[in-house]
A protein has these predicted regions:
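N-terminal Sec-pathway targeting helices
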Residues: 2-14
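Hydrophobic membrane-insertion alpha-helices, especially the h-region
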Residues: 12-23
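N-terminal low-complexity, Pro/Thr/Ser-rich intrinsically disordered segments
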Residues: 26-60
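Short, solvent-exposed secondary-structure boundary motifs
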Residues: 47-58, 73-82, 172-178
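Conserved beta-strand hairpin/beta-sheet module of binuclear metal-dependent hydrolase folds
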Residues: 63-123
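Active-site HxH/HxHxD metal-binding segment of metal-dependent hydrolases
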Residues: 108-179
């Protein structure tokens, strides 16, 4: 039987790749080459951190950052902060970054997702000679463990919030037949 967590990760990455390809098609100029022959290869970590049994004793970062490839990052919420251990994805392209999901914890003090994403954007821009990367914040689906830190991005400059309702999502992506 396939591993459901691995399947969910692969499904989320596939959705993200589709969404970012759609988002990048809206960008008129490109300086990086992103061939569209399929998903770019990358590597998963040997093991995800799990946090400590007690959040008081935890020494692991609140957000584990894994570089899947040059333009794709997989983030994981520390399970000592929230038992869900939510996964989030950041995809980079010409002038645009796409954040899929925002985890299970809203508090920036406990779960500084925006700070981590801002640092990733800054580092990626420096490495690839990009500036003013626009961030799109979207969700794979609307369970609370996927959008709790949404509030951290609402006032972020140069950011588009796709929305949390079915209508907002379908209007933004242009879906006409979406479940």
């Amino acid at each position: 039987m396939p591993n459901p967590k691995r399947y969910a990760t692969i499904l989320s990455v596939t959705f993200g790749l589709f969404a970012i390809e759609l988002a990048f098609s809206l960008v008129p100029t490109a300086t990086l080459n992103f061939p569209s022959e399929g998903a770019a290869p990358g590597e998963f970590p040997q093991q995800w951190i799990h946090g400590s049994k007690s959040a008081l004793d935890n020494t692991d970062p609140a957000v584990q950052v894994h570089r899947f490839n040059d333009h794709t990052y997989i983030l994981r919420e520390n399970k000592a902060i929230n038992y869900e251990g939510a996964f989030m994805y950041v995809f980079f392209g010409n002038g645009v970054a796409l954040l899929i999901d925002q985890g299970s914890t809203s508090s920036p003090a406990l779960f500084p997702l925006r700070q981590v994403v801002d640092e990733l954007i800054d580092a990626w821009e420096t490495e690839f000679g990009q500036t003013s990367t626009h961030l799109i914040v979207a969700n794979s689906h609307l369970h609370g463990d996927h959008y709790a830190a949404w509030n951290q991005f609402v006032d972020r400059p140069n950011t588009t919030m796709v929305g949390l309702t079915h209508e907002e999502v379908t209007n933004y992506w242009g879906f006409t037949n979406y479940p």
